[in-house]
């Protein structure tokens, strides 16, 4: 019987735990404050930012919005980040991506104080993950590890295949699985005989940005399949990188889209916000 991994349920549990940790800090006179920076008026970005603000409100985290016009220059954005870095009342800084053309995203990410980098994108935090030190970890991969652990899915000793090598998901995902003692293979657009590789996977994480690309022929019986993708099909319905109906019956566990990995990303962002404060107060 296939287990449908419920990201909404687990994300709610994590947000409740974060809420308790925030309350404990408040009892000691310590607030948690996240600065949310949005440049331009991209509708999808506005939705994501609003969802993050709602999660902050639920968890008792203060959120401060900095909504800048599309015409904002890179220098102006970097100046704001510098001010937020130096503001002791700000614990976390989130710059909503993508940024308008003409602004170097890497430069902006690198300008954020690593201790306030709640997205976990700064090279210092990525490096800490690489060498096994404590740091703020990219939210989506961290959320996937939480899903696996809370569903008692063993990673140690398992063949883990990650499809996709992005800095936001693929690479940190591989490092986190390695940290949990999985045997990890990363596939990408130049991988030969992709099916031969994916059919070895006990745990298959798919983050390639192609709707319903992975069907049942890519998956071995009893595998755990984690779908990171999110798209709208021709009918306007949400779907992932995995063809859920084709794959589901072959798996022992699978994340749906929506309601799988997506909610975990915001829950782990909230976790990083409170961790940024706890790391300073220890």
What are these regions (language model features)?
Residues 56-70, 184-186:
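Short beta-strand elements in bilobed, periplasmic/extracellular small-molecule ligand-binding domains
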């Amino acid at each position: 019987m296939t287990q449908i991994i419920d990201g909404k349920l687990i994300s709610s549990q994590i947000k409740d735990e974060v809420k308790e940790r925030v309350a404990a800090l408040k009892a000691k006179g310590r607030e948690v404050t996240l600065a949310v920076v949005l440049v331009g008026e991209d509708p999808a970005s506005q939705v994501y930012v609003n969802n993050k603000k709602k999660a902050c409100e639920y968890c008792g985290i203060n959120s401060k919005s900095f909504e800048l016009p599309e015409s904002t220059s890179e220098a102006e954005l970097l100046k704001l980040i510098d001010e937020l870095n130096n503001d002791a009342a700000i614990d976390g800084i989130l710059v909503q991506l993508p940024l308008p053309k003409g602004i170097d995203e890497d430069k902006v990410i690198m300008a954020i104080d690593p201790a306030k980098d709640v997205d976990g994108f700064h090279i210092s935090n990525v490096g800490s993950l690489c060498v096994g030190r404590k740091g703020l970890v990219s939210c989506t991969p961290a959320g996937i590890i939480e899903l696996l652990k809370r569903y008692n899915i063993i990673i140690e000793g398992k063949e883990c295949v990650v499809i996709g090598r992005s800095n936001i998901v693929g690479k940190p995902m591989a490092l986190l699985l390695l940290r949990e003692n999985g045997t990890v293979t990363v596939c990408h657009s130049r991988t030969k005989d992709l099916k031969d590789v994916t059919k070895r996977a006990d745990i298959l994480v798919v983050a390639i940005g192609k709707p319903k690309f992975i069907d049942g022929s890519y998956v071995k019986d009893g595998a755990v399949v984690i779908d990171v993708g999110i798209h709208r099909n021709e009918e306007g319905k949400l779907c992932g990188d995995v063809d859920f109906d084709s794959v589901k019956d072959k798996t022992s566990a699978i994340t749906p889209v929506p309601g799988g990995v997506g909610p975990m990303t915001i829950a782990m962002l909230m976790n990083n916000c409170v961790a940024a404060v706890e790391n300073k107060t220890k």
